[in-house]
């Protein structure tokens, strides 16, 4: 899907090589819509800015990368927390001005038999933080390990496993029956092994465990929402993928 809002971006290559270091800066019209063209909303002040930098590292003679970025928006958003009294008195839901987020990623080989070959074993990690309102994901953490070609007679095989945790800003609604919250923190784990049956055929078994952020099943079809299931347990998903390369 293409980007629909208008924007402007700058890409800088401090060393001249995009594989070594890249810095990007973007400004995007936060009011852009897919069914509207022109520059009517570009200068209204609702703008989202993004700056990001990526650097290749060589700690201990092993390839790695460090990436950090930030996002800031001047747009007004709907607040995650709502109060019925505020809605009645103002005739509108509560709003939040501006939003921000920060993120950091890294990947690092722990074993790299030949530089640039793409083979070896490495770890990766991610961290993200936001204002927590209006952004529902307050903090995000993930860590994992992966590798390719670690068996001498299986140079094309790959494997990976990772864990993530999302600290959710639980939306709250305050009404006549008190304050209710609707979500919880989410976490999950995934592991896979990509087996190269031939150079052009790859078979990948996969397993995932996910405890979702949604903690209740609510039926909203009637005039009054009804909780039809009070607890949602962890889901286990088994998968098998076949890839044919032409």
Q: What is each stretch, according to the model?
A:
Residues 34-40, 77-85, 134-139, 171-177, ...:
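Outer-membrane beta-barrel translocator domains and adjoining extracellular loop/strand segments
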Residues 230-246:
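Outer-membrane beta-barrel "beta-signal"
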């Amino acid at each position: 899907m293409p980007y629909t809002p208008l924007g402007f971006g700058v890409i800088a290559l401090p060393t001249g090589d995009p594989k070594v270091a890249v810095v990007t800066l973007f400004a995007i019209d936060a009011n852009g819509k897919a069914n509207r063209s022109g520059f009517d909303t570009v200068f209204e002040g609702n703008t989202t800015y993004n700056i990001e930098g990526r650097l290749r590292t060589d700690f201990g003679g092993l390839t790695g990368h460090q990436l950090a970025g930030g996002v800031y928006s001047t747009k007004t958003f709907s607040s995650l927390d709502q109060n019925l009294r505020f809605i009645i008195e103002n005739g509108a839901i509560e709003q939040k001005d501006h939003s921000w987020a920060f993120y950091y990623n890294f990947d690092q080989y722990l074993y790299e038999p030949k530089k640039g070959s793409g083979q070896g074993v490495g770890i990766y990690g991610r961290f993200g933080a936001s204002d927590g309102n209006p952004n529902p994901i307050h903090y995000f953490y993930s860590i994992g390990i992966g590798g390719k070609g670690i068996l001498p007679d299986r140079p094309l095989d790959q494997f990976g496993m990772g864990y993530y945790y999302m600290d959710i800003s639980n939306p709250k609604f305050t009404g006549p029956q008190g304050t209710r919250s609707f979500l919880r923190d989410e976490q999950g784990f995934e592991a896979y092994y990509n087996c190269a049956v031939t150079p052009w055929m790859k078979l990948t078994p996969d397993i995932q465990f996910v405890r979702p952020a949604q903690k209740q099943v609510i039926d909203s079809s009637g005039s009054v929402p009804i909780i039809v299931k009070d607890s949602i347990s962890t889901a286990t998903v088994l998968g098998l993928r076949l890839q044919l390369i032409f």
